[in-house]
Amino acid sequence: MKTKLNELLEFPCSFTYKVMGLAEPELVNQVVEVVQRHAPGDYSPQVKPSSKGNYHSVSITINATHIEQVETLYEELGNLELVRVVL
């Protein structure tokens, strides 16, 4: 994945992912599980429901150590079945 993030970020740094997906109970656990694989830590993601309650947005901040870690997490979070968008 070619991005300009590498030019914009200085590692290590805090990096927040906003994951939007279906409002299913397992969404948050799946997001944390993927993040734990690449950036182990103690996470307390923030969850906000959509106005109609069909979707949830999950915000989770990691301590990113390199651009490959950031890009891999974008890809793996986007591949989760419940996820619709990763910002």
Swiss-Prot record:
One of its GO terms (cellular component) is cytosol. It comes from the Bacteria. InterPro entries: UPF0250_YbeD-like, YbeD-like_sf. It holds the Pfam family DUF493. Belongs to the UPF0250 family. HAMAP family: UPF0250 (MF_00659). This is UPF0250 protein plu1293. It comes from Photorhabdus laumondii subsp. laumondii (strain DSM 15139 / CIP 105565 / TT01) (Photorhabdus luminescens subsp. laumondii). The lineage of its organism: Bacteria, Pseudomonadati, Pseudomonadota, Gammaproteobacteria, Enterobacterales.
